[in-house]
A protein has these predicted regions:
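Extended, H/D-rich, highly charged conserved domains that either
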Residues: 1-125
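Generic detector of bulky aromatic hydrophobic side chains
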Residues: 19, 42, 53, 67-73, ...
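TIR-domain catalytic/interaction hotspot
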Residues: 119, 123-137
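SIR2/sirtuin-family catalytic core signature
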Residues: 132-278
């Protein structure tokens, strides 16, 4: 392995440079993508923790701000080519932006490569992302794992996630969702320490997931369904091939509800038959 060979330092530096430049060159198409649906399916009470180096999720965040500022937090657990970090003031943002304190442009974040022994404490930004992610998982009602196969090179990462999720006997009400092309039986095997009995959903289609069917009210809808026996409507969410105008129309009522809900209050149940509560 190159990381364990001092004589390959020059080659390693060149390889990392090419990797960084390649991922930096990627761009989203103009039409809506899964990245956009994912970002808009969540609100400020949610977190997206990603292992991806590419800038596509960051680009989705930037254009989803045109619809609402009520978007999820984003933590890049292996760094990201589109994110910069000011070590002096512990501020981060878009790579082309400036630190709000010193007004200097953000230096790029470090990328964490798939080596045998990853150290998540070496880099301040990555450590901060992990600390925040663990804290959010500890307090979460739902956990969605989207296309992450838990490779052998990420054993430490999975261990950290499990530590945050805690023992299953303390997760008897929570729900775990998996969106993946891997067979369901294999998913159950890989993630058995995150699944309490039957409290999980598996799908290979984002639009059939809780996030896709109940965007921006996922936790509220799942809780009402299983804890309060309130049947949801699953025909009101995102669907394939939507235009930006259709997305704006779909989420406009949701955003209005969010803007008019008092701080500390729950958002109204949205994906239900209104007659049940009239």
């Amino acid at each position: 392995e190159l990381y364990n060979r001092p004589d390959c330092k020059k080659e390693l530096t060149e390889l990392e440079k090419r990797i960084y430049n390649y991922f930096s060159s990627l761009e989203l198409p103009d039409e809506p993508t899964i990245y956009d649906y994912l970002v808009l399916s969540l609100t400020h009470k949610d977190v997206i923790a990603t292992f991806n180096w590419d800038p596509l999720l960051i680009q989705a965040f930037a254009r989803c701000h045109l619809f609402t500022d009520n978007l999820p937090h984003l933590f890049c657990l292996h760094g990201n080519v589109a994110v910069g970090y000011c070590k002096e003031h512990q501020e981060f943002g878009l790579l082309k932006a400036q630190c709000p304190i010193c007004k200097k442009y953000y230096p790029p974040t470090k990328l964490l490569y798939p080596v045998d022994q990853k150290n998540y404490n070496d880099d301040d930004y990555i450590k901060g992302c992990w600390d925040a992610t663990e804290a959010m998982i500890e307090e979460s009602f739902m956990l969605t794992i989207f296309g992450y196969s838990a490779p052998s090179s990420d054993k430490k990462a999975v261990s950290l996630l499990k530590r945050a999720w805690g023992p299953l006997e303390k997760r008897q009400l929570e729900e775990t969702c998996f969106i993946d092309i891997i067979d369901e039986s294999e998913i159950r095997k890989r993630w058995e320490e995150f699944i309490y009995t039957h409290h999980y959903q598996y799908t290979n289609d984002f639009f059939q997931s809780y996030l896709g069917m109940f965007p921006r009210r996922t936790c509220e809808t799942v809780f009402a369904t299983y804890m309060l026996n309130v049947p949801p409507r699953n025909d009101m969410g995102f669907h394939k091939g939507m235009t930006w105008n259709e997305i704006e129309e779909l989420i406009s009522d949701l955003v209005h509800e969010e803007e008019t809900t008092e701080d500390g209050k729950n958002y109204p149940l949205h994906y239900t038959n209104r007659g049940l509560f009239s």
